[in-house]
């Protein structure tokens, strides 16, 4: 059962003064919040690797550590977390700089318990509302994106997906980044007999091995430093429904035996708790990586792969669904001009030709982002090539040659490189790619970018 603190949110306090940490912690725990403390930047970083926090109170003066640098690292590690700066009167200007860098508010020392409680309640309410709004917007915006198709290859995949959705068979969805794996997983859940139960998603690249085990199976109070309350895992949250493991190729190798056991026996233990629990969960997984090659290289367990790929669905990349490109573009344009109140109503012939020729390494996600940008900057009735950000000639020259074989990793690396080159900041690049900042950080590290 979810505790009060789990419902209200998890808070991280970062301050090098133990008396302030103690006072803040007692005040917030009295309100029922789950609170963890860190007295230095390395301690805070270690906690963020193990736990998910909704809110952080960060002191700008952390001994030798620069609070703005700590804030920047937090934005990479936990971009969803709201950060409130705590500062002295003499550093208010720096607090304003911190807000421009991503903090959401600041408190001036000494602050009263009422000020602290009010700030926590306000920011956690915003966090909860934002999460709900993002979930609703994501569901509405992505419902069926890229799944409606005139392509025979895509139609065959959808027909198979509808047939197997009615069963409880595990399904592995293969496809390049942005090809619609998440949308297909959502559709399969909707078509299944589990549709009235939750579909819970874990984005595997965004979690470290330590955090993954806690997020997947939950943990008990005192299981590790900072674990002040017991938490439910995603497995428990998905009981009766569907667990979607997005980018399963990035699932930590050290945890794969525990995942295998859960898939086989439906049994698991929370971190720090010997009690064996059960959950009735259907597993969907997706990846843009070659799991067979990873098995051969010792990077993925063969027995786990056999459990995951009972049914395999291969999503074709957008460049192999040429008949769908313009239809998707028109649908996206109609949506975005309505959202933003822009004048565009269609595409020039040059723009249509450029979209036909472009290889779309980022697939449907890239097409959606390109059209969103074009709808915003276009001040006329027809979107032209300049609004798309590429020309027909450039599109043709960048398209894969017939017979050329590129791995999914090569395509993803090329796509990420191109997007970063055309983006002013890494945050902008992550948004264009449709991933969060921490996932982009891991991808850059993976590909040496």
From Swiss-Prot:
Positions in coiled-coil regions: none
Gene Ontology terms describing biological process: alginic acid biosynthetic process; negative regulation of single-species biofilm formation on inanimate substrate; phosphorelay signal transduction system; positive regulation of cell motility; positive regulation of DNA-templated transcription; positive regulation of proteolysis; positive regulation of secondary metabolite biosynthetic process
UniProt key word DNA-binding: yes
Domain Sigma-54 factor interaction per the UniProt entry, residue ranges: 147-376
SMART domains recorded: AAA, REC
Keywords: Activator, Alginate biosynthesis, ATP-binding, DNA-binding, Nucleotide-binding, Phosphoprotein, Transcription, Transcription regulation, Two-component regulatory system
Annotated PROSITE patterns: RESPONSE_REGULATORY, SIGMA54_INTERACT_1, SIGMA54_INTERACT_2, SIGMA54_INTERACT_3, SIGMA54_INTERACT_4
Pathways involved: Glycan biosynthesis; alginate biosynthesis [regulation]
Sequence positions that bind ATP: 175-182, 238-247
Domain Response regulatory residues, every copy: 10-124
Pfam families membership: HTH_8 (PF02954), Response_reg (PF00072), Sigma54_activat (PF00158)
Domain of life, source organism: Bacteria
Family annotation (InterPro entries): AAA+_ATPase, CheY-like_superfamily, Homeodomain-like_sf, HTH_Fis, P-loop_NTPase, Sig_transdc_resp-reg_receiver, Sigma_54_int, Sigma_54_int_dom_ATP-bd_1
Post-translational modification remark: Phosphorylated by KinB.
The entry's DNA-binding region: 426-445
GO molecular function: ATP binding; ATP hydrolysis activity; cis-regulatory region sequence-specific DNA binding; DNA-binding transcription activator activity
GO cellular component: protein-DNA complex
Modified residues (4-aspartylphosphate): 59
Note: In vivo phosphorylation of AlgB is not required for its role in alginate production. The mechanism by which it activates AlgD appears not to be mediated by conventional phosphorylation-dependent signal transduction.
Role of this protein: Member of the two-component regulatory system AlgB/KinB involved in regulation of alginate biosynthesis genes. Positive regulator of the alginate biosynthetic gene AlgD.
Name of the protein in its database record: Alginate biosynthesis transcriptional regulatory protein AlgB
């Amino acid at each position: 059962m979810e505790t009060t603190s789990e419902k209200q949110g998890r808070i991280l306090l970062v301050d090098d003064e133990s008396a302030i940490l103690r006072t803040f912690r007692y005040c917030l725990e009295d309100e029922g919040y789950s609170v963890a403390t860190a007295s230095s930047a390395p301690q805070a970083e270690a906690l963020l690797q193990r736990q998910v926090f909704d809110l952080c109170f960060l002191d700008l003066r952390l001994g030798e550590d620069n609070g703005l640098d700590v804030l920047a690292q937090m934005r990479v590690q936990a971009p969803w977390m709201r950060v409130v700066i705590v500062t002295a009167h003499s550093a208010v200007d720096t607090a304003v700089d911190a807000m421009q860098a991503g903090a959401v508010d600041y408190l001036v020392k000494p602050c009263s318990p009422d000020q602290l409680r009010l700030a926590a309640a306000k920011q956690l309410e915003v966090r909860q509302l934002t999460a709900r709004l993002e979930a609703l917007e994501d569901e509405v915006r992505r419902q069926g994106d890229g799944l409606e198709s005139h392509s025979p290859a895509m139609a065959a995949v959808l027909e198979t997906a509808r047939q197997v959705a009615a069963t409880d068979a595990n399904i592995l969805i293969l496809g390049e980044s942005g090809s619609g794996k998440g949308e297909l997983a959502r559709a399969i859940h909707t078509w299944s007999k589990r549709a009235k139960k939750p579909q819970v998603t874990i984005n595997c690249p965004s979690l470290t091995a330590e955090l993954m085990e806690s997020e997947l199976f939950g943990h008990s109070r005192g299981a590790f430093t900072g674990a002040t309350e017991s938490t439910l895992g995603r497995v428990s949250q998905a009981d009766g429904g569907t667990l979607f493991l997005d980018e399963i190729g990035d699932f930590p190798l050290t945890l794969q035996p525990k995942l295998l056991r859960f898939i086989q026996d439906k049994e698991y233990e929370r971190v720090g708790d010997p009690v064996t629990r059960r959950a009735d969960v259907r597993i969907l997984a997706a990846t843009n990586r070659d799991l067979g090659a990873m098995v051969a290289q010792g990077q993925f367990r063969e027995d786990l792969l056999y459990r995951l790929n009972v049914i395999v669905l291969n999503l074709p990349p957008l460049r192999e669904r040429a008949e769908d490109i313009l239809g998707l573009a028109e649908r996206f344009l109609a949506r975005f001009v309505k959202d933003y109140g822009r004048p565009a109503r269609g595409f020039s012939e040059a723009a249509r030709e450029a979209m036909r020729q472009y290889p779309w390494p980022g697939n449907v996600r890239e097409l959606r982002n390109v059209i969103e940008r074009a709808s915003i900057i276009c001040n006329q009735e027809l979107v032209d090539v300049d609004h798309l950000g590429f020309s027909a000639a450039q599109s043709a020259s960048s398209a894969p040659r017939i017979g050329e074989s590129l791995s999914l990793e090569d395509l993803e690396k090329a796509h990420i490189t191109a997007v970063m080159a055309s983006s002013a900041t890494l945050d902008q690049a992550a948004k264009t790619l449709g991933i969060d900042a921490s996932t982009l950080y891991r991808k850059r590290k993976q590909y040496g970018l």
